[in-house]
Amino acid sequence: MRHYEIVFMVHPDQSDQVPGMIQRYSTVITQSGGQIHRIEDWGRRQLAYAINKLHKAHYVLLNVEAPQNAINELETNFRFNDAVMRNLIKRMNHAVTEESPIIKMKDERREVVELTTSGSEDNQKDHHKEDLDKKTDEFSEEN
């Protein structure tokens, strides 16, 4: 069996159906004796150019090891599913199991956001304490 990387783009209005689609396509692969190495749901992303007057799409990545008949069935499913806007099936030399660069970037951004928000909360607390100290000093000076 050969290794494949499969990326498909789903119409943004059909994003709620993506988990079911992933399950359906995974079943096609596993029932034919294939193996799934990685599934990544990239979510809604901006398109580089409009496709059918749409500027966003929901992206999904699969890395699989499957026989040719399973890949042919997937291609047929993609072709007849109106929710799938585009798809790409690429043959790979080996199984890819590590996270894709897109997921790594998302994780890094999430960490940066968490660090900056926690830092800003500390700054807000410090400013709040300083304001209270000033008001307390002003009140004690008046009395």
UniProtKB/Swiss-Prot annotation:
Alphabetically ordered keywords of this record: Ribonucleoprotein, Ribosomal protein, RNA-binding, rRNA-binding
Residue ranges of the region described as Disordered: 100-143
Lineage: Bacteria, Pseudomonadati, Pseudomonadota, Gammaproteobacteria, Enterobacterales
Molecular-function GO terms, alphabetical: small ribosomal subunit rRNA binding; structural constituent of ribosome
InterPro entries in the record: Ribosomal_bS6 (IPR000529), Ribosomal_bS6_CS (IPR020815), Ribosomal_bS6_sf (IPR035980), Ribosomal_S6_plastid/chlpt (IPR020814), Transl_elong_EF1B/ribsomal_bS6 (IPR014717)
Gene behind this protein: rpsF
Record family assignment: Belongs to the bacterial ribosomal protein bS6 family.
Biological function: Binds together with bS18 to 16S ribosomal RNA.
Protein name, as recorded: Small ribosomal subunit protein bS6
The organism of origin for this protein: Hamiltonella defensa subsp. Acyrthosiphon pisum (strain 5AT)
